[in-house]
């Protein structure tokens, strides 16, 4: 049945108890066609008139009958099953599910969706910061969740409530009013150029030189690196095709998945030395489809296993702590410092655009600008 308009400004009357009441048509039952009558109360006629005008305007925007069906918890469950889970990677979907079931439902899940406020969400974030960790007995761990985890919960809530606005369940998104924690930026570290040789020597002694050499000259993400197969190597054109990464399927089992974005699907040019190393590696296990199979299973390495090998290499050489992801930063930094243009580096990294790369590596581009300024200064000194 077509939606009927709300009942103008509604009707206002004074009740026997002295209060003023305003009644209005909030909508119509889809099955019976009967009007859904709502009311507002106040001490004065002016107060009720103001409330009534707001309620009538809201009734034009919100599907009141459906809005009354949901608490925050039941809406999040509906949103997760219909809009999130079918379109997200398994790991992201699990992250959302745990956030809903473990952190949101026990605290504010019973709040009616239409009454949820930005302050309710802000109190949620505060509580999670102070008492959110479920396993408080973990050594060295604070009782609260990390800022990055809370920020992720905020992003999820914002998306779910945006959907509620689109479905006319609420007038506006209360998450718009929130101030989620800021995520502290990790200090960007790189493997110093003078230590690269000792790092690769240690990798060679552990039998993983081709893998880590390729990492340093390509900046692949760890999931992309372990998912490489021999069919991804083009010997003649000296390229590596990146079209997949290690992930988990819908059953939570290790599997090969597509990268998160289309920009991550790319071809990377590699030097002849890298091609030679990879060909020699292939000759050690010519029938295995994986470029870097695990010696224990002959299957694809788990990304965490590669991180553990990286830590052992650092320990072997006495180098300072460095995340595996910092090898990616090492590639990007050294490429920029050695004159590779930002657009090329961006495409090799699989970034969305060169602007993101510029922002991520501001410290390097600043040095490049200083060198450019010095060169121009020298040039102008010669012509003056």
Question: Where are these predicted regions, by residue range?
Answer:
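C-terminal secondary-structure termini that scaffold catalytic or DNA-interacting sites
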Residues: 1-2, 201, 237, 248-265, ...
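N-terminal DNA-binding module of tyrosine recombinases/phage integrases
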Residues: 4, 15-21, 25-123, 281-291
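Short, basic/aromatic-rich helical patch in the C-terminal catalytic core of site-specific tyrosine
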Residues: 22, 121, 157, 161, ...
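Active-site/catalytic core of tyrosine-dependent DNA strand-transfer enzymes
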Residues: 98, 193-194, 237, 245-248, ...
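Basic, Lys/Arg- and aromatic-enriched nucleic-acid-binding interface segment
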Residues: 134-147, 151-155, 166-230, 235-236, ...
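C-terminal catalytic core of tyrosine-transesterase DNA break-rejoin enzymes
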Residues: 166, 209, 213, 217-224, ...
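Catalytic-site neighborhood detector that most strongly recognizes the C-terminal catalytic loop/helix
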Residues: 182, 190, 246-248, 298, ...
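Short, polar N-cap/turn motifs at the start of nucleic acid-interacting alpha helices
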Residues: 232-239, 321, 340-362
């Amino acid at each position: 049945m077509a939606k009927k308009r709300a009942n103008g400004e509604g009707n206002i009357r004074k009740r026997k108890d002295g209060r003023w009441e305003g009644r209005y048509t909030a909508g119509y039952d889809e099955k019976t066609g009967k009007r859904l009558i709502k009311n507002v109360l106040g001490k004065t006629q002016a107060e009720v008139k103001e409330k009534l005008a707001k309620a009538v305007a809201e009734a034009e925007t919100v599907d009141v009958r459906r809005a009354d069906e949901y608490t925050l918890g039941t809406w999040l469950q509906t949103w997760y099953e219909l809009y999130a889970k079918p379109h997200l990677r398994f790991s992201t979907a699990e992250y959302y599910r745990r956030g809903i079931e473990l952190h949101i439902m026990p605290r504010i899940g019973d709040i009616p969706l239409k009454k949820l406020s930005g302050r309710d969400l802000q109190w949620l974030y505060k509580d999670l910061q102070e008492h959110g960790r479920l396993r408080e007995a973990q050594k060295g761990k604070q009782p609260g969740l990390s800022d990055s985890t809370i920020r992720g919960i905020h992003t999820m809530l914002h998306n779910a409530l945006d959907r509620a606005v689109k479905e006319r369940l609420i007038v506006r998104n209360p998450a718009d009013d929130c101030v989620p924690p800021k995520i502290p930026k990790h200090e960007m570290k790189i493997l110093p150029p003078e230590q690269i040789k000792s790092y690769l020597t240690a990798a060679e002694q552990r039998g993983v030189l081709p893998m880590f050499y390729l990492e340093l000259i390509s900046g692949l993400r760890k999931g992309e690196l372990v998912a490489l197969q021999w069919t991804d190597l083009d010997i003649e054109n000296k390229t590596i095709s990146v079209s997949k990464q290690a992930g988990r399927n819908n059953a939570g089992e290790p599997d090969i998945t597509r990268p998160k974005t289309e920009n991550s699907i790319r071809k990377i040019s590699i030097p002849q030395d890298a091609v030679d190393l990879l060909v020699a590696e292939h000759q050690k296990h010519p029938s295995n489809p994986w470029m870097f199979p695990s010696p224990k299973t002959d299957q694809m390495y788990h990304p965490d296993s590669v991180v553990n090998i990286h830590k052992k290499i650092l320990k072997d050489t006495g180098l300072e702590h460095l995340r595996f992801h910092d090898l990616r930063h090492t590639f990007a930094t050294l490429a920029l410092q050695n004159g590779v243009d930002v657009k090329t580096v961006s495409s090799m990294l699989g970034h969305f655009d060169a602007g993101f790369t510029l922002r991520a590596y501001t410290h390097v581009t600043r040095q490049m600008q200083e060198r450019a300024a010095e060169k121009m200064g020298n040039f102008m000194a010669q012509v003056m």
